[in-house]
Amino acid sequence: MKPHANHQLLIMLVLAIITLVAVACNSGNQRPQSASSSSFPATPATTASPSSSMGDMSTGHFMRNSPNAAIAPYDLQFIDTMSEHHRSAIQMAKIAEAKAQHAELKALARNIVDSQQRELEQMKTWRDKWYPGKPEAINMDLPGMMESVMDMGKLNSATGAQFDLTFIAMMTSHHSGAVAMAKDAEARAEHPEIKQLARQIVNAQQKEIEQMNKWKAAWVGN
């Protein structure tokens, strides 16, 4: 073989070796697509909390749906939903006991706390007796419930005479929601005890609504 031919062959061998080394290095550095993707944690999906849909827990009591509440027995739905409704009314009334300017509004607030606390205890007794161990069944789709969600931050921030009018506006709306659900229970409840409580709620809270509206008419502009 001629020296020139040997020189060309040597160059070709060197180039071939360099190419093989480069390919090997490149394939060693590459990772499968799935491995690269799995090395980074997935960004968690943003989910709305119950408080974001029904109120802010930092500013007061909030109401929310329980999972599968609509398939629970109606009387259990009423007990759990009205109990939650009562708890929010009690919280509002306790704020009024401390901040209301009119003595008669403070007295009403105390009566709301006392009467609804008694009803809460009665409903808990029934729940323990009739539905022991059953999961919570708060159903915000029952009549009057969505209208009963209150902005506790607004009530907390109100002062002076404006507080009294704000409380009246919120509590009359809240009571109206309770009356709507109680009337529904009068027609649909299975237990006579629930029907009787429902009538009691309708009668008591309608009277309180009427009284608050009279006060509002007398106090506006004074």
Question: Each predicted region: which residue ranges?
Answer:
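All-alpha RGS (Regulator of G-protein Signaling) helical domain and cognate RGS-like helical scaffolds
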Residues: 30-222
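Bacterial signal peptide processing site
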Residues: 26-28
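Bacterial N-terminal signal peptides that target proteins for export
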Residues: 2-12
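C-terminal motif of bacterial Sec signal peptides marking the signal peptidase cleavage site
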Residues: 20-24
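Hydrophobic helical h-region of N-terminal Sec-dependent signal peptides
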Residues: 14-19
